[in-house]
Amino acid sequence: MAKRDIIKNQFHTYKDTYTGTNVTRLTEPDHVSHHMYFYNNMMTSDGKKLLYSAELNGERQLYLMDIETGDAVQMTEGTGVADYSGMITADDRYLIYRQGERFMKQDLDTGEEECFYETPEGWSAGGDLGPSSDYKYMSIVETRKDTTAKRKVGGNWDAFAENCLAKPLCRIVYIDMEKGTSRIIHEERCWLGHTQIRPIYGDKILFCHEGPYDLIDARLWCINIDGTGLTCLREQPSDLIITHEIWMPDGESVAYVYKETTGKMEENIRMIPMSTMKEEVFMNCSPYAHFNVAPSGKYMVGDSQGHDVPIHMLDHSKEKDRTGEVKNDFIYIVDVEARKEIKLCYHGSSWRAIYGNSQDTHPHPFFTKDSKHVIFTTDLEGKPCLYMAEV
């Protein structure tokens, strides 16, 4: 298949057994498909088209789906397409994605492409792309190839701890996507990830020290875009899990999931306002593996994990649980103003890293533009598929 080819997805709608929510499967379980990394902007402004990845004919490419008809246009071709990297610019003009070490900008109308940045020889690009609100700038992490763990990170979790302990030389690069210029913001011997430019303000970059919770020094870090003001946002003892930090849409606070593995075993959503830099407990929550915030900031969504073992420590060689036991593998909605959690639907993910990318079965829920639906991924009915649940 080639760019601009069209595939047709057959939708299947059902009522969730446990909540009665209407859920529509958008892709079919005979092949792997998933949406982009769940912090990315992967829908057009009118909410009618969705960017996702599908593995067909042995390769993964990006597709743009009409969520009313199921028709999807192939947007990329060739090898090395980073299948979680795609995003649509705020003005709906361009598709941004990474292919190998090249960062591409594609005109959605004409299909014309240009490379606006390429990682230098000896370094590798990885992880997530962190754009500014206006999509003029982007932050990424580059890693010196000869400093990483010997085993490849990504296909499964085998090298997760190994790469953390290797303390690879990583750097945060700040890219001007319009001018094609770049500069190094920060560099250190530590596995870095999840760079996110502060919304609205654009003056800071949130990032993490990556790796198992009991091996890292602290996960949450922030730095000014000029490279000054490196700050650890929160100390982290080795028995505490902090995960999936995200800027609130107004850029005023960083939110994240806090989970104790000893003691009271508290699990809640916490925030750090930039005005005070002091942690606040927002509300208790179910055991989210990931969570996200609606563009309006009025709602949050999380994918609960029905077992206590961290995802990277699961035995992924085990077959999918077929006992029929229903654990707390549900999608939850949070009303931010009411600080109330509502069970939306069962995602039933196996959480297994067996399909080629360790993230493939992760639900990674996110809201549609109007906050009337939540889209997520799960292998509930076969290989990972895209689902859309009514809110």
Task: Give names to the regions the model predicted.
Residues 2-24, 164-170:
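Blade/loop signatures of beta-propeller domains
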Residues 4-6, 140-167, 208-217, 259-263, ...:
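Short, conserved, GDST-rich strand-edge loop motifs in beta-rich repeat architectures
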Residues 32, 36-39, 57-100:
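Blade-loop segments of beta-propeller domains
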Residues 283-342:
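Loop/turn-rich, solvent-exposed surfaces of beta-rich toroidal or solenoidal domains
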Residues 361-391:
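Blade-level signature of beta-propeller repeat domains, shared across WD40, Kelch, NHL, RCC1
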Residues 237, 280-292, 339-366:
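Conserved blade-ending motifs and adjacent loop-strand segments that build the rim/top face
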Residues 80-170, 184-187:
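Asp-box/WD-like beta-propeller blade repeats and closely related beta-sheet repeat scaffolds
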Residues 40-49, 85-94, 98, 128-137, ...:
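Blade-terminus and WD-like Trp-Asp/Gly-His loop motifs, strongest in beta-propeller folds
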